[in-house]
From Swiss-Prot:
One GO term (biological process): signal transduction
Subcellular location: Cytoplasm
Record region (Disordered): 67-114
EC number: 2.7.11.18
UniProt GO MF annotations: ATP binding; myosin light chain kinase activity
Protein known as: Myosin light chain kinase 3
Keywords: ATP-binding, Cytoplasm, Kinase, Nucleotide-binding, Serine/threonine-protein kinase, Transferase
Segments forming domain Protein kinase: 404-659
Superkingdom field: Eukaryota
The protein's role, per its UniProt record: Kinase that phosphorylates MYL2 in vitro. Increases cardiomyocyte contractility. Required for sarcomere formation in the developing heart.
Amino acid sequence: MGTSLYRSTLLSTGGFSVSDYIRKFTKNKPDVNNIQPNVGFCHQSTQTSQQVKEVISAELELQQPEVTLPNDPSSQHSPEAHTGASEPLKPVSAGESSKALQKAKEISVKSSEPTHVQTFAPAVHLEQIDVHNVPKQETNSLVAAPADAKCVIETMTKVEKDIALQQERALERADDSHVANKVFLKSIIPGQQLEKIEDPQQQAEVSLFVDEDSLEKSVPGQHLDKKMEVLQKQAKDLPVVDEDSLNLSAPGQRQLEEKVDVPEKAEKKIDEAHKKMEEVPRKDELCIEKPVIRHAGIKTQHEETMGMETTVPKHDESKCPTETYVEKTENKNADVTLESDKIMICAVSPQNTSLDEDEKSKAAPLRKVESTLLIIDDSPPLPAPFDHRIVSAKQVPINSYYAVNPVEVLGGGRFGQVHKCAELSSGLTLAAKIIKVRGMKERDEVKNEIGVMNQLNHVNLIQLYDAFESRTNLTLIMEYVEGGELFERIIDESYQLTELDAIVFTRQICEGVQYLHQQYILHLDLKPENILCVNSTGNQIKIIDFGLARKYRPREKLKVNFGTPEFLAPEVVNYDFVSFPTDMWSVGVITYMLLSGLSPFMGDNDAETMNNILHAKWEFDTEAFENVSEEAKDFISSLLVSAKCSRLSASGCMKHSWLNNLEDKAKMYKVRLKSQMMLQRYLVAHRQWKKHFYAVAAANRLKRFQQSRSISTPN
């Protein structure tokens, strides 16, 4: 019977010979010629894709069996060479199986893909440790078949001792396993020599893989059936051996690859198929934890560590390998939704946590600085709550459109009083300036003010909303400003008015005056009482009271004899022609008062005051200007000049160094600018939003990528 049946391969643990088992179990069984070998595929590492199947079929169709005669010296390897080659084996009888080694066939193994593993047992799914369920990353493992119970016990003892160390090194070995063992199984022919790994550890760990197509080509069916029946029974009794402990060492892998003999055409086709496989993006590059796809009878690494029980689940022999693969593919497709959800969580939640921590760390010193340093409000004022409009006086009762509160008085003067009111149709809060008129001259002056305000549309100038005319009064409905007069802040000793505050106020005044002069309008009554603060805490201002304003025409000589004495320009006192520099003198006086709280030309009476103005008798008070910068003094000196042509214009003031580089001045005075703080907060919020946007966009791309892969996966 030894001559009629092909000699089995030697399982190199303890000199065990499969031929003894073949004789034992096939002694009284008749040969069956028509039965085809039932060789199955076992899912050892991960699911097998259609491209992997194409690679395997290409290799099997194009490979040529390599026949080595038993007595050929070239097929023998030197036992002295420690290169992983096998020693020549001698044939043995039935009674001498444990003492003599038989001549076995030379086997060269080449796996078609790192994710595809074959085994003898078609109906057995070995238990695996799914460290990283990622394609193209699991290592090829060769499953050992122990010879007897003693070998099995020794192997399991070794596995249990090394399981803790294997858990720690699992991720490292998974990353280093990209260099796969590309080996394939050649046909088994009588007389060939069996490759044997001389490494002591590998002698107990090598397993053989038999390809169904190659067996059909090279082995008669009747003998193969008997042999496969024996091997199937033997495989059912085998315990599961840890996958990582059975990996071939790098030298052994290289020695096996040296034995590969594939035709050039087959190599080209295989390389092309491998390139197609490598074009698919690897999931391990996505840096995303993926849910473990669980199958019946398969434990995860954590479960195996906790339970330490290795059992081989029973397999229904009615199921063919193709059905098993389809079932696993369906399970993989079913878990795509869970995987996508996990991608969203991993891509957003951890990053959001890190972003929040970063923003908190950045915001902590910012809050500390805000609490210790003085904050200067340099933000520009908001525009009026209504659009600019052209207004004409209506000769209808004001009570039909507005509800005026006669008790709440906002201000007053020579013209009358200002009351708070509200529009009946919209509820908009406004201010009603009620001016008493006794004759046509006064009425014309008020209508002139309406005409001037119709031309003004600037954030630093008060806006006109509506106007009403009656027999005794003219009422102007204007924008409501609640902060009070700038003069009140100047004289308030409890209010801390710094030089930077004065810069902010002066710059806004110059901006408003510049706009007036661009419209060829002269205010002619600029003073702190006619400059209102938008609110009680901020530094935003609006210029009001255009009752004395005039339209400037260069060809017409304009003279005025009115105004507040201490703010009058020399040309007004002399009753000379007025022009744009007249307003700039008033700006210089206001700036002097903002920095010192004093009036530069104030005398004991109005006559002395105007005399000081005519002769330009003023100086910087030593005590008041002790801590004022030279730039501020130069700015004032450039405005309080007797000659009109020598004064700075509004545009020139805007270019002066004192009104610019506010950020540098804030650092020098160790204060904070509100606009700078708002800008920093905006930039921090914008960066945080941008990071969140990129995280969500990346998660969406990954989700679409997973969906496309699930659609392209064959069923």
